Amino acid sequence: MKYDTSELCDIYQEDINVVEPLFSNFGGRSSFGGQITTVKCFEDNGLLYDLLEENGKDRILLVDGGGSVRKALVDAELAQLAVLNEWEGIVVYGAVRQVDALSELDLGIQAMAAIPAGCPSEGIGDSDIRVNFGGVTFFSGDYLYADNTGIILSEEPLGLDDDDLDDDLLEE
């Protein structure tokens, strides 16, 4: 499903938070949306592997990497695991690598930057906790919608089948 965050902002302005424009799209999907699972980890992606092995249907992994762009938290192997388990997307407050491979995957990926350096996979970090970046506080269970224009957050799923929506807003 495709989302237009500008249109969603116009319709649901009282019900959403808009994340500051810190992110670029690195995945093969230009837009994505779903319920978030939060992770906080700094320059270590071991916990991401554990979480992305779960069923990701209608889910987005939201990663607070402390804004570090010194080491990439997401690479092609990790993103491929997300695709295999049907995740909608990954948002990284940090960096990714292997961007050419990421752009070929049927997965939404937004991050701050790309860098070739990888990180260890020791499993250090926490999941399902409150995280804050980009002027927004995220909780596991919130709903996130992203496209090339930006990222928005809602406590509840947006009524995407409402008659209010433009016909081009959603495409299968």
Swiss-Prot record:
One Pfam match, given by its short name, reads RraA-like
What keywords tag this UniProt record? Cytoplasm
Biological processes per GO annotation? negative regulation of RNA catabolic process
Task: Name where it mostly resides.
Answer: cytoplasm
Q: Does the keyword Metal-binding apply?
A: no
Q: Which CDD domains match?
A: RraA_family
Q: What is this protein's function?
A: Globally modulates RNA abundance by binding to RNase E (Rne) and regulating its endonucleolytic activity. Can modulate Rne action in a substrate-dependent manner by altering the composition of the degradosome. Modulates RNA-binding and helicase activities of the degradosome.
Q: Which HAMAP family match?
A: RraA
Q: Return the protein name.
A: Regulator of ribonuclease activity A
